[in-house]
Amino acid sequence: VRFFWAAHIVHHSSDNFNLGTAVRNGWFTIIYKPFFYVWIVMLGFPPEMLIVCLGIESLWQFQLHTKYVPKLGFIEKFINTHTMHQVHHAKNIEYMDKNHGGILNIFDRMFGTWKELDENIEIAYGVTTPPNSYNIFTILTHEYKNIWEDMKKSKNWKHKFMYAFGPPGWSHDGSTQTIKQIRESIKATENKNKILKNDTTQNKPNQKETVVEVLSEIG
């Protein structure tokens, strides 16, 4: 949801990945985050238990923001580790919108958003629409400004709604694409190139058969 992403983008807009990034958080997240947790108390769980769990998660998330811890073997089967969080902060096409888990990666694996770090790919940290400013208010609000500018592109209220609450990158005219659309376009292009390559290979005359035909004609 782009409106929520506009608050969280502050955390991702740094082109560095270190412990400083861990405490780089948007002010507006306090508006929506409580809604993700209040139902736990409403179900009857003690508030103290929730606070302790959130504290443990925050500490784990803090120390994940480092590039100096290698892959951790077996525990990566179910725990969200440092290399996985590097993937989460990358703006490489193959890494975007991956590894959302706080401590466990079980749900990422279940819903297809888990991605292992490929050490042969150089990671580019940050976001595709950076604030390009050191002004704190620009950093905090630049994506909200982008949403407003996009909403003015169409008079259709459904389009306006999607610009605010649809996935980041959505556009009514195809001028920008979501990460899902980008991946689908890349995959379609790769498949097309593969088919063309196969057709070229199949239509290429066999050199041995060609030589035999030439010799037959000479004879």
How would you label these PLM feature ranges?
Residues 1-124:
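Membrane-embedded catalytic scaffold of the fatty acid hydroxylase/desaturase
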Residues 121-219:
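Cytosolic-facing loops and C-terminal tails of multi-pass membrane proteins
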